């Protein structure tokens, strides 16, 4: 059997299905830890008759999963990855079986019988972090890649996983340490004529650090939008066409549309990808003065979501002049990124004045 490789704090071997649960063509089970190689050799029978660990690591091998009685469970491909050259930096075995729930459940159950325990959510990535294969920023990037909703967010997450952000932060740390060294030199050797030179060096160094931090903060906000979506709130007084706009953007009848004012009484939230930018699109109750208790709650929620909005889409009724409710809404979005849409253009209101 192959030599065991692991640097984890625990000697426990873990296993789990790492593909999405549900019926599919292929499902993958990952086993990681000190006993992964031994479990792989017990579980897998290659077409050549050789043990899995006797094959070249990192190459897929064709064969079958077998149970304790040597009965075939499923036709699979298996791969052995010797630590530390694996995702977790431990010995890892991955089995690619048919994606049926029963097949995956049976194979996973066999790994438990052979000494593995169920992996906790995120535990493979946790082990990769604890074993030093990735840092915390790269670990967070793994989930960002999985949850990417656009090509732009995927590219950003891949750059983060490659360590580009980590390198920038390490560079900042080096610059700050250089500044500390210069300051300590002035303190430790006050008799030396280096104070002016050191002051200039420290000043230039701090300015460089400041510029780099401003750059990172600017792009952090962009990254947050790409990961979580731009909070976009559609607002307006009742019956101006907010719900119709939401339905048109989503290309489906998501919100009830009626000729009667006040149809929307609660917040409706949906996801929309606009080009490469994900939006969290929020349709709100029409903002107006009302005595209806339920509608009052809806109006209060509308104002609350508007306060938190990163982009406001204000819908105005082009068939009527601006009124106090319109002006209240326009005042509320002052200073906030805003798009103003004049609806009902075919009935455009014109003043006689």
Locations of the language-model features?
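Conserved Switch II/interswitch segment of TRAFAC-class P-loop GTPases
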Residues: 309-323, 347
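Flexible nucleotide-interacting loop at or near the entrance of a catalytic core
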Residues: 151-235
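Conserved small/polar residues in nucleotide/adenosyl-binding loops
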Residues: 349-353
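Conserved G1/Walker A P-loop phosphate-binding module
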Residues: 215-291
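Short, conserved loop/helix-junction motifs that constitute active-site signature segments
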Residues: 331-335
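Substrate-gripping "pore-loop 1 plus following alpha2 helix"
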Residues: 293-301
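A glycine-rich (often HGG/GG-containing) alpha/beta subdomain
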Residues: 1-155, 159, 163, 339
């Amino acid at each position: 059997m192959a030599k065991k490789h692991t640097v984890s704090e625990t000697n426990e071997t873990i296993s789990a299905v790492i593909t999405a649960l549900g019926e599919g063509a292929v499902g993958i089970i990952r086993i990681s830890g000190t006993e992964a190689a031994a479990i792989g050799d017990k579980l897998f029978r290659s077409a050549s008759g050789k043990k899995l660990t006797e094959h070249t690591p990192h190459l897929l091998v064709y064969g079958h999963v077998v149970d304790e009685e040597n009965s075939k469970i499923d036709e699979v491909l298996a791969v052995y990855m010797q630590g530390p050259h694996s995702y977790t930096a431990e010995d890892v075995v991955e089995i690619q079986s048919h994606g049926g729930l029963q097949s995956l459940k049976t194979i996973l159950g066999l790994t438990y019988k052979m000494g593995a325990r169920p992996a906790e959510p995120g535990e493979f990535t946790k082990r990769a972090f604890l074993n030093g294969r990735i840092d915390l920023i790269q670990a967070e990037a793994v989930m960002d890649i999985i949850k990417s909703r656009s090509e732009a967010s995927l590219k950003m997450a891949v750059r983060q996983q490659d360590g580009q952000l980590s390198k920038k932060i390490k560079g900042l740390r080096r610059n700050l340490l250089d500044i500390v060294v210069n300051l300590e030199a002035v303190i430790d050797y006050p008799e030396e004529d280096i104070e002016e030179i050191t002051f200039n060096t420290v000043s230039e160094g701090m300015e460089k650090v400041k510029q780099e931090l401003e750059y990172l903060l600017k792009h952090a906000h962009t990254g947050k939008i790409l990961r979580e979506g731009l909070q976009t709130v559609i607002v307006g007084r009742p019956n101006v066409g907010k719900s119709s706009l939401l339905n048109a953007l989503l290309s489906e009848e998501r919100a009830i549309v009626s000729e009667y004012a006040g149809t929307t009484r609660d917040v409706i939230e949906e996801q929309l990808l606009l080009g490469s930018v994900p939006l969290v699109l929020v349709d709100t109750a029409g903002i107006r003065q009302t005595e209806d208790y339920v509608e009052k709650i809806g109006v209060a929620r509308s104002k609350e979501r508007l306060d938190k909005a990163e982009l406001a889409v204000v819908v105005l009724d082009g068939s009527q002049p601006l009124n106090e409710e319109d002006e209240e809404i326009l005042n509320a979005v002052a200073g906030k990124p805003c798009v103003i849409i004049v609806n009902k253009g075919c009935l455009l209101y014109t003043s006689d004045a």
